[in-house]
Each structure stands twice: as C-alpha cells, then as structure tokens.
C-alpha cells in the first residue's frame, strides 16, 4: 500500500464517529410492604439526567422465568435500552416480577401481590428517589410475554397511574394455557376457578377503556404462540373503537424479536410524552 493510501485510510478511520452510550444503570433494592420482602430493580438513567429537570419514566417488565436484569443483559445488543434511554431522554425502570407473578395480586398466595407492588409501591419509590414526572402524563409501561400481559393489565386497571402502555408478544389471554408458566399456582386450577382466569386475562378488561384515555401499542410476531390471542385482543379493541397501534411481522418468541420491538415501543412512548406534556 502506498504512503498516500495509508494516510487516506488513517484519515477515514479517525473521521468515523464513535458512539458512546452514557446512560447509567443502577440496581436498586425496593421494599414491598404488601409482600413484606425486598425486590430488586434496574433503573436506567439517560446521560441528560439531572435533578433540575423532570424526566418521563418507562416501566419495562420481563417475562416468565426472567428477572429484573433481562432487559439490559439478554437483548442481542446489550446497549439497546441504554441507547434508547439516551436518545429519548427517559428513565427506564425494570422491576423484578417474581419469576412467574403475571403481575396481578394472587387471590391465593399473599407472597405474590405484584399488581400492588408495581402500580403503587414501586411507582412511589421511583418518584421519591428520582427526578421524574410524577403523574400519568409522564409514565408508560410495557413488557415482553408475561410482562406484556402485566403491562396492559396494570395500565387498564390503573389509568390514573399510567398514561400509555404496550405489549410485546404478550400472553394477553391466560385461558388457553391452563398448564403453563405457574398461572395455576397464582389463580388456582382453571377448571376449578374459571372466574379468576376470566377476571385476570387482559382480553377481558377492554370494558375498562374509553377512547383516547390510554395510548396503547401491541406487537406480536406471526410465528409466536401468543399470536392468535394478540389478534383477538386487537379485534376486541377495534370492536370497542379503542384507538391503538397494532404491529405484527414475521418473528417468534425470543429476544431477537423483542430487542427490535422495544425500539418501536419506546419511540411511541416518547411521542406520547412530548404530546401529553405540551
């Protein structure tokens, strides 16, 4: 290689921008009074974070079998959530969901009261500890799989707390899966307690919604085992004239899909935050 070519190569290399994600990741320990135990959460703060400004917050829930660290450790690009937090200037909170809590208050197990924990105790902790917008205009919630169910469930039932919600590959109807993911341990057996399964399936909570009260985004891959129940939820929302974004594309139930989907969801929430706070 000629000297002039080497020089050109060096110049080109030095001109390539280096992207640094400066978002900070805290692991915090919260205490649940209702469950009488400590629960961990990851909190991602954007590089622009300052106590002098109030930041919107996204609550990002993990799936069955996962934990609070999944969203910063399991996506193909482990910087995904940090990068999006930086780019969109939002705080991201990833709580632990007790492996298979399904994010509701179990009627049979007092150690699984995750609806109360996430929608009340955790939100109060975050608003006290961090500089956040402390009303529904600055809060969104989404998640994957079990967390997708949980996010919609909590937002539908607590519209005074969350202004926007989403789901990625969410298990939005529990009833087709009576033997899976410890749901029966939280609600009792389906054939013995069908009313509990009905009452705690997101697809049966659309009557709580009124048009334009909640910003809603639902995403599920066509190869996902939850695809049919997501289409059914979409159809039910359409029948009730509830505006929402519904995304479906080729994909299955894995982090490759969710690592892509979360970018669309966070952009959607960023637009909601900007619009609602104007």
Tell me the role of every PLM-derived stretch.
Residues 2-12:
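Sec-dependent signal peptide recognition
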Residues 12-21:
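Hydrophobic h-region of N-terminal signal peptides that target proteins for export
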Residues 22-278:
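Non-catalytic cap/lid and distal C-terminal segments of serine-dependent acyl enzymes
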